[in-house]
């Protein structure tokens, strides 16, 4: 089954579409984590929207240190989700509705912290809870310092996530910022 391949590496963003497939009407949940390369997620949103994909976004607490909810909302043309507990509508469980809505989940940049949390099955924020509650394809685009990338814990966590069926895309070598 040929979905589509998204190559959003640490230092370059491009979308490669399978020859017989396109992103029109695809529901993509973009989870933006707190790393210096988070700003590149803005370009990814723009590219996905240009391909007529439906994009919803989750910002982790740390992601908001690098990109603003306003810029993400402007590009995605929708609400930015950032809290596990929805004060506006307590009856709505965003982690369930978002996990059901998405055709695919992208984690950009997938930080060492996020990779560790997902590997451990932690669900202490909206992003990790949505992913844990989902049965959809999950693509992780790791972005971190080379020493963090090469650390045995990171390698072990990535191997565990691969065994769960998560797709790891990248990283490449280059500048993060």
PLM-predicted stretches and their roles:
Residues 1-2, 17:
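Feature targets compositionally biased, intrinsically disordered low-complexity regions
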Residues 15-139, 145-177:
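A cross-family phosphate/adenosyl-ligand binding-site feature
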């Amino acid at each position: 089954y040929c979905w589509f391949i998204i190559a959003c590496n640490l230092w370059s963003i491009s979308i490669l579409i399978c020859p017989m497939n396109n992103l029109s009407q695809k529901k993509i949940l973009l989870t933006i984590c707190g790393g210096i390369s988070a700003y590149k997620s803005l370009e990814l949103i723009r590219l996905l929207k240009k391909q007529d994909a439906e994009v919803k976004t989750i910002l982790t607490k740390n992601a908001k240190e690098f990109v603003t909810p306003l810029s993400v909302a402007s590009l995605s043309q929708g609400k930015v989700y950032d809290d596990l507990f929805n004060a506006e509508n307590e009856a709505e469980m965003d982690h369930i509705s978002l996990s059901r809505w998405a055709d695919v989940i992208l984690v950009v940049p997938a930080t060492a912290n996020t990779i560790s949390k997902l590997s451990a099955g932690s669900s202490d924020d909206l992003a990790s809870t949505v992913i844990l509650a989902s049965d959809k394809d999950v693509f992780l685009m790791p972005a971190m310092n080379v020493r963090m990338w090469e650390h045995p814990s990171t390698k072990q966590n990535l191997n565990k996530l691969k065994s769960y069926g998560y797709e790891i895309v990248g990283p490449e070598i280059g500048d993060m910022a």
